[in-house]
């Protein structure tokens, strides 16, 4: 049974409430006997401080205060360390988060007892023009940098040129990201334990361009005719210049989330499927 000893705490620095909740989390963890390290950007002075990148190699788990965006940022920065993440939701949605502010005391108590499960989510590795650009937990998007102006891209799978399409762009998502931008663009919902990539065109200019699900072991490549008219966006947060072919493959890293018994389908029904 995995029982963390050293807990890292981070959160949204632009939200005063998040800083206050982070302070409370630190106190709760301290009382339960955890060693606490705090993201130095939070400015909490009572506990040892460390930058987020270094936190990944110093702690046994990280508690994030915010929402899904906070989790995506932390997961990307600490990707190589695969540190388990417990998300505390202060936002409106929080599909990846596990607890609310009201459930903090019980959550920290369960952490101390080792009363939780670890849930693994696959990531994608991104290269642009042969240069390694890290991992995506949700998706990598190649999109027009000029609103209302389409781009022409070529999609290849394992070196085989599959199609050429005019569109606003195209994204390659993980199963985790299937409930994010890809879903809004008409892509399918895929359970995180399915090892696949979802290729979803964005407003394509032909009826036959449809979302596609391929093995995560495939190499997906995207070439844009006029790279200066497009950009690459990772997890909706990191913007990059398009300096060559975008190559997307399975990452050797995974994201690990702490769960207290909730299942994927329970969260899916609660957040998305309100058909009853």
From Swiss-Prot:
What's one GO BP annotation on this UniProt entry? Answer: NADP biosynthetic process
What is the name of this protein? NAD kinase
Q: Which HAMAP family match?
A: NAD_kinase
Family, according to the entry, reads as follows: Belongs to the NAD kinase family.
Q: Which UniProt keywords apply?
A: ATP-binding, Cytoplasm, Kinase, NAD, NADP, Nucleotide-binding, Transferase
Q: Which organism is it from?
A: Methanopyrus kandleri (strain AV19 / DSM 6324 / JCM 9639 / NBRC 100938)
Q: Name one Pfam family in it.
A: NAD_kinase_C
What cofactors does this protein use? a divalent metal cation
The question of whether Transport is a record keyword is answered with no
Listed PANTHER family: BIFUNCTIONAL NADP PHOSPHATASE_NAD KINASE, NAD KINASE
Q: Which gene encodes it?
A: nadK
């Amino acid at each position: 049974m995995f029982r963390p000893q050293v807990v890292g705490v981070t959160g949204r620095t632009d939200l005063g409430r998040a800083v206050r909740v982070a302070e409370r989390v630190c106190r709760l963890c301290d009382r339960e006997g955890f060693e606490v390290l705090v993201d130095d950007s939070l400015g909490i002075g009572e506990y040892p401080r460390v930058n987020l990148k270094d936190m990944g190699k110093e702690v046994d788990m990280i508690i994030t205060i915010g929402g899904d965006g906070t989790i995506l940022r932390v997961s990307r920065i600490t990707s190589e360390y695969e540190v388990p993440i417990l998300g505390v939701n202060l936002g409106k949605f929080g599909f990846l988060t596990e607890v609310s502010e009201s459930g903090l005391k019980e959550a920290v108590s369960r952490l101390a007892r080792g009363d939780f499960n670890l849930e693994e989510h696959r990531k994608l590795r991104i290269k642009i023009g042969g240069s390694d650009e890290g991992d995506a937990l949700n998706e990598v998007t190649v999109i027009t940098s000029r609103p209302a102006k389409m781009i022409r891209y070529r999609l290849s799978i394992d070196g085989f040129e599959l199609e050429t399409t005019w569109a606003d762009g195209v994204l390659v998502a993980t199963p985790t990201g299937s409930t994010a931008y890809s879903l809004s663009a008409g892509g399918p919902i895929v359970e995180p334990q399915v090892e696949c990539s979802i290729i979803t065109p964005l407003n394509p200019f032909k009826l036959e361009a449809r979302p596609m699900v391929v093995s995560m072991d495939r190499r997906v490549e995207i070439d844009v005719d006029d790279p200066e008219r497009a950009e690459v966006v990772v997890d909706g947060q990191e913007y990059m210049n398009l300096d060559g072919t975008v190559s997307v493959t399975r990452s050797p890293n995974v994201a690990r989330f702490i769960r207290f018994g909730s299942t994927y389908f329970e969260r899916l029904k609660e957040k998305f499927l309100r058909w009853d």
